[in-house]
Amino acid sequence: MPRRYWRLVFFTGYSLLTTALALPHDGQIVAIDPNREAFDVGLPFIQKVGVEHKINFIDSDAISVLNEMLTNGTLKMEFDFVFVDADKPNYINYHEQAIKLVKVRGVIAYDNILWYGSVVSNEEEVPEFLCIGRKPIIELNKYLASNPRIEIAQISIADVA
């Protein structure tokens, strides 16, 4: 069972809460998000079910925090599971940091990896609101597919066209 979980960006905290509930009592989550207000929306629910002690919330930009932690050695743990749901243009940067922090045989999961099916659509057919994230997601998929250090399993969960 995973004990250490790293979460990048979480909106209102629903999946953060469900993950905290699933972790053992001594499980730890490092949650990084530049929007404290979003965390505060879910905080009363996190407190109500008694899992606040599992969550270390960091109100900041994930790239700079992780670079600092890796450089200064302030992050003295390996993670069993990393979930990235952040700015799509930085997914490859997040991957490079995550690979240094996740245990051997650990899991790194990315949200929107199929980007509502747009990654296999002709560019002209992609709705405008999906265009901004489409190219970085395609680049990440190519990057991961060519990386011999990892195994890939893609699962579509509610990310449908």
Regions inferred by a protein language model and the residue ranges of each:
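S-adenosylmethionine/decaboxylated-SAM
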Residues: 1-161
